[in-house]
């Protein structure tokens, strides 16, 4: 099991526990925001399970090149990563939008009462757990560099922020009991839910945007510039006429195709010499490993490069 998968498994385990606690405490306290918090965690945990499966597939594709699985998907599994990331981010945004609509409806209907003691206990537990898991995932990802873990850490930060705001609201509601401000109690839960859901809706947007760009194979400008600079140096060094480069980033994978236009009637080279040039270009591009798909071709016919 890779380090990435280990971190995701622990995140899933803790998230499912928090989700169960959230739904239970939400029912006992009568808090819609706590129930939403639990359902939100459950949604996140379910998507993290899918994320873990995809991470395993990508790892298996990089190691077992001749397995039955890679025979059916011999171009790799990179394309699954942006799909899962986009789906995950979209579902988290959708859950927050639904919570916002629910909170507005509750406000318009006069709010509702709840047991602040149970709600405060739940919120305190989740805030502590969320901060611990966010820090754990962030520290682990320093050496891993996984987009999956980036999104998982964002989810923990979102959960901690949401529940932290709930904790403040619940403590305020508990403190005003028996005072002249007690009339505000029924509105605390829906107002807290409305504020939190509004704040977290845009957080997964950048992840969804990047996932969509990967799915559509939008050319990354930085990668394209890097490849073009290297290819231009090779054109000048070996006397080629020009080159054509095609690049894309799909999840953690980089797909690079370079076609060099060679002069017609040039001096013949042994195949070993062409391979040496390929190796030289590959070393300059960098990132050699299972997450780089590099194709380098030489031709005298421009039509093959277009």
Language-model-detected regions and their locations in the chain:
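Alpha-helical transmembrane segments and adjacent TM-loop junctions that form the membrane-embedded core
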Residues: 4-10, 33, 47-306
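Short, hydrophobic transmembrane alpha-helix segments
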Residues: 24-37
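Active-site cores that bind ATP or allylic diphosphates and position pyrophosphate for catalysis
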Residues: 40
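Alpha-helical transmembrane segments and their membrane-interface boundaries
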Residues: 43-44
């Amino acid at each position: 099991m890779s380090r990435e998968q280990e971190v995701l498994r622990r995140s899933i385990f803790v998230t499912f526990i928090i989700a169960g606690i959230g739904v239970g405490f939400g029912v006992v306290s009568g808090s819609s925001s706590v129930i939403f918090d639990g359902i939100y965690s459950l949604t996140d945990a379910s998507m993290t399970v899918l994320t873990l499966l995809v991470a395993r597939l990508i790892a298996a594709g990089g190691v077992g090149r001749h397995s039955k699985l890679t025979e059916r998907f011999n171009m790799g599994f990179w394309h699954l990563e942006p799909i899962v990331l986009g789906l995950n981010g979209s579902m988290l945004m959708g859950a927050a939008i639904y919570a916002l609509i629910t909170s507005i409806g509750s406000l318009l209907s006069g709010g509702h009462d709840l047991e602040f003691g149970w709600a405060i206990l739940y919120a305190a537990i989740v805030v502590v757990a969320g901060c611990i898991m966010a820090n754990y995932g962030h520290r682990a990802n320093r050496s891993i560099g996984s987009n999956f873990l980036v999104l998982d850490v964002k989810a923990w930060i979102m959960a901690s922020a949401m529940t932290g705001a709930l904790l403040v609201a619940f403590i305020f509601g508990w403190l005003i009991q028996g005072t002249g401000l007690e009339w505000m109690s029924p509105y605390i839960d829906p107002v807290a839910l409305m504020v939190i859901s509004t704040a977290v809706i845009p957080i997964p947007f950048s992840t969804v945007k990047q996932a969509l760009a990967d799915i559509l194979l939008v050319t990354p400008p930085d990668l394209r510039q890097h490849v073009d600079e290297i290819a231009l140096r090779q054109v000048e060094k070996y006397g080629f006429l020009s080159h054509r480069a095609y690049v894309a980033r799909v999840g953690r994978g980089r797909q690079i195709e370079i076609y060099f236009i060679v002069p017609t009637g040039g001096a013949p080279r042994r195949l070993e010499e062409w391979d040496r040039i390929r190796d030289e270009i590959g070393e300059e591009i960098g990132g050699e490993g299972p997450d780089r798909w590099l194709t380098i071709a030489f031709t005298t016919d421009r039509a093959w490069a277009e």
